[in-house]
Regions:
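Hydrophobic, aromatic-rich transmembrane alpha-helices
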Residues: 351-402, 445, 462, 522-540
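Perimembrane helix-loop-helix junctions
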Residues: 239, 267-297, 388-389
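Transmembrane-helix motifs of polytopic, lipid-linked glycan transferases
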Residues: 163-190, 229
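Membrane-lumen/periplasm interface segments of multi-pass, membrane-embedded glycan/lipid transferases
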Residues: 305, 309-388, 497-519
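Membrane-interface alpha helices of multi-pass inner-membrane proteins
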Residues: 246-262, 267-268
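Transmembrane helical bundles and short interhelical boundary loops of multi-pass, membrane-embedded
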Residues: 363-369, 456-547, 551, 572-578
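Transmembrane-helix signature of polytopic, membrane-embedded enzymes
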Residues: 32, 159-162, 183-206, 458
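Interfacial juxtamembrane loops and adjacent helix segments
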Residues: 72-168, 326-328, 359-363
């Protein structure tokens, strides 16, 4: 071939042929910043497993109880059909949860060697002093079956109750740990390598409330993992991957989400929207992969909701049962409107999204901190939708990323609003219910602030991480001051520190070294992550190619691993089509 001759052109000697372009670019490592952010995210959750004594997570007593019931071979239960286990009642009743009259440092607790197992405290016998049934029976069984598997491991049934709870918590930690990595991979699939993908990966590390929820026994954590995993193949769908096996993967992950929690019932809308937009963007019908996704998801998780309709004549029954549900709801008290409810909803969701530290609220970050973070996230995501991801229907494609979070928030709004109009209650308004949609929001936020930052967009990951670490420092300082500092040490900084460390060691299920190791890891990894972010801002990077406005042909789809390889080389693909 002569210099400057394009492949496929004709010369005097005949058509020129060329070797097909390599569609598999060299594999790249995950950026150091994303590895550091993921490690820091893990360390923060590990720290929270110690900062929060057993059963201080939201509804943690009942999540542990249901996992314990499944470990005994019981369940699923009808509404109102699961009384609290006597063993759970005994060990929970012996604690001051949350601290009522003072910090944990001043509350009595059994020495570590004298704490009984759940089995030794009464096992699965019916609770004697707590008559209210376990409401968690309304949830699908997957999370509890996973946790039950941990409780059935050899020797676990004989461990002290706080170590049993700690092991269950670590299952949650491992579920939420990959979130920064998955957010980065999803963003990179859509917009390529660069500051935008790094920003998306850093955002999950900025939420103290996420560190808290990820460190306790709660089925939200399985939903967070399932939806974050689902975002990655949906990003492939939006970029033209309409293969049947990708549809099967989408269906599998959607089905697992449906087996995690009822909030997942909004996800089929997001999946259908992604395939519809992919049809418009790439002008290829996705009916077969979409049908495969529907069938697989129904077989994996959709059956649970059909079962509810058949047995209980409703999609999700009240887990308390009719009698207790009516008692807890209370009598009607008219006079309130949806307009009255909206600002109350916004304030509570804002406080519990970036905050959500206590049980249920105190200690609490200032409203301007939690509200400022949430406003910034929403504003950045809206700009990200306006910018789009490039190519045909780019704004529509970007908007599908927000659908899970919007759907979760809409369900919360409707459920709590109905109760508020009925008699003024504000139940179920928790930021953790929206965390499963955080991956899509992180990508949109990163796109938006990247556009707003212009040439300074390279600094965004560093600034975001620094702001997030300051928020964490503020949050955990509040928690330690209220929960762990002995009252008699207030005013003496040295005594405050020694007293808090001593109290944490006393309440911990573990000896001193594993108790303090997560705190040391956070102290070490925080500057390491900041250094990695600073190096990422200084290191020049080639700009990612703009997504082609032309629809990608099926031949342009490859099987590369999104977590290990960059986006396809647009120039090579254009050459191949000539």
């Amino acid at each position: 071939m002569t210099a400057g001759t394009a492949p496929g052109t004709r010369t005097a000697a005949g058509p020129v042929t060329a070797d097909p372009p390599d569609r598999r670019p060299p594999r790249r490592r995950v950026p150091a910043l994303i590895l550091a952010a993921t490690a820091l995210h893990l360390a923060l959750m590990a720290m929270c497993t110690v900062l929060y004594p057993a059963f201080t997570g939201p509804d943690e007593t009942f999540h542990v109880d249901l996992a314990y019931a499944y470990s005994k071979g019981h369940g699923p239960y009808p509404p109102g059909g699961r009384p609290l286990a006597r063993g759970i009642e005994v060990v929970y009743g012996g604690l001051t949860v949350p601290p009522a009259d003072g910090p944990y440092a001043d509350a009595p607790v059994r020495p570590r060697g004298q704490r009984p197992s759940i089995e030794a405290a009464g096992g699965d016998a019916r609770a004697q002093g707590y008559p209210v049934p376990n409401q968690m029976v309304q949830h699908p069984p997957l999370y509890y079956l996973i946790e039950a598997g941990v409780l059935r491991l050899p020797g676990v049934d004989r461990l002290p109750y706080d170590r049993q709870v700690a092991l269950l918590r670590w299952v949650s930690v491992l579920m939420v740990a990959p979130l920064p990595l998955l957010a980065w991979a999803t963003a990179r699939r859509l917009v390529g390598d660069g500051p935008v993908a790094l920003t998306a990966g850093v955002l999950p590390v900025t939420l103290p409330g996420l560190s808290h929820i990820g460190a306790v026994v709660n089925n939200d954590n399985l939903l967070i993992l399932a939806v974050a995993l689902l975002a990655l193949p949906l990003a492939r769908v939006l970029t033209g991957d309409l293969r049947v096996r990708t549809g099967a993967l989408v269906g599998l992950l959607l089905g697992l989400a449906l087996l995690a929690k009822g909030l997942a019932l909004v996800l089929p809308v997001a999946v259908a929207a992604a395939y519809l937009v992919a049809w418009l963007r790439h002008r290829r019908r996705p009916l077969i992969p979409l049908a495969v996704a529907a069938v697989v998801s129904a077989g994996v998780g959709g059956w649970w909701w059909v079962r509810n309709v058949v047995l209980f004549h409703t999609v999700q029954p009240d887990g308390l049962g009719p009698a207790w549900g009516t008692l807890f709801s209370g009598p009607p008290s008219p006079g309130r409107t949806w307009l009255d409810f909206a600002p109350a909803f916004a304030r509570r969701l804002s406080a519990r999204f970036w905050g959500g530290l206590g049980y249920p609220d105190a200690p609490q970050l200032p409203e301007w901190v939690t509200g400022g973070w949430l406003v910034a996230l929403v504003a950045g995501a809206l700009v990200g939708i306006a910018v789009g991801i490039g190519g045909r229907w780019g704004r529509a494609a970007a908007s599908t990323l927000a659908l899970p979070a919007v759907g979760f928030a809409a369900l919360i709004f409707y459920g709590a609003g109905t109760a508020y109009v009925f008699n003024g209650r504000l139940p179920g308004i928790h930021g953790r219910y929206v965390y499963a949609g955080l991956t899509g929001l992180a990508v949109l936020f990163a796109i938006g602030v990247g556009r707003l930052g212009g040439r300074l967009g390279r600094l965004v990951p560093l600034l975001l991480l620094a702001a997030g670490l300051l928020t964490h420092l503020w949050a955990w300082r509040l928690l330690v001051a209220q929960w762990w500092v002995p009252r008699h040490t207030v005013g003496d900084h040295g005594a405050v520190l020694r007293g808090a460390i001593g109290a944490i060691r006393l309440w911990s299920p573990w000896p001193t070294v594993p108790t303090l190791a997560p705190f040391v890891a956070v102290v070490v990894l925080s500057p390491a992550a900041l250094l990695a972010a600073a190096l990422a801002t200084r290191r020049p990077r080639e700009p990612s190619p703009e997504p082609s406005p032309e629809p990608s042909p099926p031949a342009g789809i490859d099987d590369r691993d999104d977590l290990a390889e960059p986006a396809a080389d647009a120039a090579a693909e254009t050459t191949a089509r000539r």
